[in-house]
Amino acid sequence: MAVKISTIEVLILSLALLSFGHGCYGQLRLGFYSQNCQNVENIVSKVVGEAFIKDSSIAPAMIRLYFHDCFSNGCDASLLLDGSNSEKKASPNLSVRGYEVIDDIKSAVEKECDRVVSCADIIALATRDLVTLASGGKTRYEIPTGRLDGKISSALLVDLPSPKMTVAETAAKFDQRKLSLNDMVLLLGGHTIGVTHCSFIMDRLYNFQNTQKPDPSMDPKLVEELSAKCPKSSSTDGIISLDQNATSSNTMDVSFYKEIKVSRGVLHIDQKLAIDDLTSKMVTDIANGNDFLVRFGQAMVNLGSVRVISKPKDGEIRRSCRSTCNNPLCV
């Protein structure tokens, strides 16, 4: 007896097989694009490598972009969207950079795999490769993919921890994203290649908590060094390395933790990590250990899982990372 299969049943079966073969967007896994865009990671690595050769500071810039995107509304590339009131326009994001590198990667990927790879995954892969390059090739963590791009980007929704917060306040924000205290301490280790502007530390140098004096938790010698770089009367907002070990401030390593342990943290939150009861032992363990890079990689993977869009109706695969698919560019 012949079995009749309806058109709808065939369609459902086809979709099920497609999902089995390629994975379902929103369900992160390693090798998500292994069948429908096999060369994507090589393409990303090539473009990122060229960008790093031109300007190695793209590494900390991309780590920051990744963090700012994931932490506010989840890893959905909403930070990349242009608009008069998009996330880019929020005060903490005005100095974020790296967008052009993402554009270059997306353009190269689209030539090989049209509307397959999300911008959110491109950010995650590019950041991973730049961490590898900044470490001198000493680490390379595997990052699951399968993210969808978000459709909403609003400056009003940006919610990032301030460098002036206490450890407890910062930890609470991480906890809201299901990121642990351990994740927080490790992710702040990205500051080992980071920089900040003088404006963020002027209070620590000249008027800590309205005392008209420097922050007593900062090494006096460092106060002197930074005051010379960030004078009160300056008309420019200078740039300061967050890792004050001059020999390794451009290298992903454990030096940042060693510096904050001897009161040479630049940002308020960085220094507090080393002296707060919640985190001081973690800082000591990392500073004295040899597995920071491995642990940092795992924390970056955990960050990359924050509020990933799991329903296709809520996300999309953009053709341009700067605009949603409501835009003609997506046609």
UniProtKB/Swiss-Prot annotation:
GO BP, one annotated term: hydrogen peroxide catabolic process
Tissue: Expressed in roots, slightly in leaves.
Binding residue positions for Ca(2+) 1: D69, G74, D76, S78
Cofactor comment: Binds 1 heme b (iron(II)-protoporphyrin IX) group per subunit.
Residues carrying sugar: N245
Residue positions of the active site: H68
One Pfam family cited in the UniProt record for this chain: peroxidase
Molecular functions (GO terms): heme binding; lactoperoxidase activity; metal ion binding
InterPro entries per record: Haem_peroxidase, Haem_peroxidase_sf, Peroxidase_pln, Peroxidases_AS, Peroxidases_heam-ligand_BS, Secretory_peroxidase
PROSITE patterns per the UniProt record, alphabetical: PEROXIDASE_1, PEROXIDASE_2, PEROXIDASE_4
Binding locations of Ca(2+) 2: T192, S248, D253
CDD domains membership: secretory_peroxidase
Disulfide linkage: C37-C113, C70-C75, C119-C321, C198-C230
Binding site for heme b: H191
Record-stated family: Belongs to the peroxidase family. Classical plant (class III) peroxidase subfamily.
Miscellaneous comment: There are 73 peroxidase genes in A.thaliana.
Function: Removal of H(2)O(2), oxidation of toxic reductants, biosynthesis and degradation of lignin, suberization, auxin catabolism, response to environmental stresses such as wounding, pathogen attack and oxidative stress. These functions might be dependent on each isozyme/isoform in each plant tissue.
Protein name: Peroxidase 60
Organism: Arabidopsis thaliana
Lineage of producing organism: Eukaryota, Viridiplantae, Streptophyta, Embryophyta, Tracheophyta
